[in-house]
Amino acid sequence: MTEEYWKGVDKIQYVGHQDKKSGLGFQYYNPEEEIMGKKMKDWLRFAVAYWHTFDQRLVDPFGDGTAQRPYDKYTDPMDLALAKVDAAFEFYQKLGVDYLCFHDRDLAPEGDTLRETNANLDKVVDKIVEYQKTSGMKVLWNTSNMFTNPRFVEGAATSPYADVFAYSAAQLKHSLEIGKRVGSENYVFWGGREGYESLWNTNMKQEQEHAAKIFHMAKDYANEIGFDAQMLLEPKPKEPTTHQYDFDAATTIAFMKEYDLDKDFKLNLEGNHANLAGHTYQHEIRVAREAGLLGSLDANQGDKLIGWDIDEYPSNLYETTAAMYEVVENGSIGPRGGLNFDAKPRRSSFAPEDLFLGHIVGMDSFAAGLRVAAAMKQDGFLDSLKADRYSSYKSGVGADIESGKADLKSLEAYAIDKPQSELIAATHSDHLEEIKDTINHYIIDTLSK
């Protein structure tokens, strides 16, 4: 019988508004409850990130790791890797999630050659596949870590060294094969070092062409082996490079269109990455969904007082409400999307149970956001605001502009003799403060029921 790793933790249940001191439990996430005709678990499709949850030691630039994990007794790298799989699947069962996400290098130690590394990885994947058969766990997405090893010091696909490009392509090939084995619904590309430190020594066009080339290779090989996954690019503006090529949603969409990738690729968007790019999470989701390219979401939050990626568990209800409003407007997160918790406990939250507590606050925060977003959508609150605001385009000159009937000459004839008083009289206050106050009331009222 497999050792119990997460002792003292039972399966997390929906407890509603019981006193939080009554124990671990969800206050707002009730997986089977229907919201706007769909179960909460189907709206949210929560996933656990293998790297932050089971590998992260809570290090920072000024101190060693503080994490206490129930598998720390294992010292042999392969024994540890296999023990983590046992611990992970117990964690998934107790938390009550259906999906996991992983990088290839999260799972197993590297060998001296790619052949040795692949052999290590295959042993761990064999065990994951066996657990999938008995647990029903699915993989939301998998990916390749092509940023940690020193070989990727100047990128993977965008490296100036052809040997590194070749190695990256070979690593990617095996990662796609693993994706097929575990039935991954999506495949993510996050280019942690696909950018530059300085433009003085960078051939930007060549590097971006190489990135596009490897993306096309990946899609072609996935088709060849019958790996039917949605391909996703994940924007981030910087860190670890000074400037990453997939800066934000708009930049990445432009890149996709430039290199004919937008038919096969969509976006995986992260809250903290949006903040680093100077945007709200809602902004990035809006840009992607209005382009028809929203694929999946990474759930975390940043700290606006801190200028780097901290991957904190989401707890800001205003932000989760805004994000979930975009999802409700879209009808889903994406064709195969979900909410992956790319998040870790704070360095001072080092106990094993903090991993459960972090996921609970994140899952509850997005479930709460879904409840509030659905209430606003069903009431038509924001829809009516926008309809009123743009009502001048429903008739007269506005209708001519919308239909394409108007041109510069006809619009000059319409506007040339209009006095300023008439133009100003046509404008109306947005009452933004009232809108924000109303949203606050929706949050308070919906979550107190």
Swiss-Prot record:
Note accompanying the cofactor annotation: Binds 2 magnesium ions per subunit.
InterPro entries: Xyl_isomerase-like_sf, Xylose_isom_bac, Xylose_isomerase
Coiled-coil region(s): none
E.C. number(s) listed in UniProt: 5.3.1.5
Cofactor: Mg(2+)
Binding site for Mg(2+) 1: E234, E270, D298, D342
Recorded GO MF terms: magnesium ion binding; xylose isomerase activity
Keyword Iron: no
Listed GO biological process terms: D-xylose metabolic process
List of residues binding Mg(2+) 2: E270, H273, D309, D311
Location of the active site: H103, D106
GO cellular component: cytoplasm
Reaction(s) catalysed (UniProt annotation): alpha-D-xylose = alpha-D-xylulofuranose
Keywords per UniProt: Carbohydrate metabolism, Cytoplasm, Isomerase, Magnesium, Metal-binding, Xylose metabolism
Primary localization: cytoplasm
HAMAP family according to UniProt: Xylose_isom_A
Subunit (UniProt): Homotetramer.
Protein name as it appears in the record: Xylose isomerase
Record lineage: Bacteria, Bacillati, Bacillota, Bacilli, Lactobacillales
Name of the gene encoding the protein in the UniProt record: xylA
